[in-house]
């Protein structure tokens, strides 16, 4: 009887775990405000330091997706290989660091947005 209850409990847990969905992240409502607050001062053309060094403009969704003179910074659907995520998560040995570090929540929002396809929504 006890084994049956554990089995039933395990099945119920797995069924409920599958029902939990991640929140949909919006570029306009969630991502853009983070970039404006933490990144735009350096990545704003024509004179932002980050823009001058890399060509990366974060002034719009389109310019962000265009990337740098070296290539893209976002791989839609893959935050693990997106340079943006590597930089804000300190997974990349670089001098590119936001003057004001992102919070754990802001990093999670950027990661989830990229993993959800980095859409302009």
Please state what every model-predicted region is.
Residues 1-2:
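N-terminal secretory signal peptides that target proteins for export/translocation
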Residues 6-17:
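Bacterial N-terminal signal peptides
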Residues 19-121:
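Aromatic- and Gly/Pro-enriched helix-to-coil junctions and flexible linker segments
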């Amino acid at each position: 009887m006890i084994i049956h209850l554990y089995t039933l409990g395990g099945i119920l847990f797995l069924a409920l775990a599958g029902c939990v969905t991640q929140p949909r992240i919006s570029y306009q409502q969630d991502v853009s405000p983070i970039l404006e607050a933490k990144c735009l001062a350096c990545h704003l053309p024509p004179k932002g330091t980050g823009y001058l060094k890399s060509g990366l403009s974060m002034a719009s969704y389109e310019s962000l997706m265009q990337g740098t003179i070296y290539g893209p910074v976002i791989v839609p659907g893959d935050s693990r290989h997106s340079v943006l995520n590597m930089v804000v998560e300190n997974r990349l040995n670089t001098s590119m660091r936001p003057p004001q570090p992102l919070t754990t929540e802001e990093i999670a929002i950027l990661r989830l947005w990229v993993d959800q396809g980095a859409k302009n929504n």
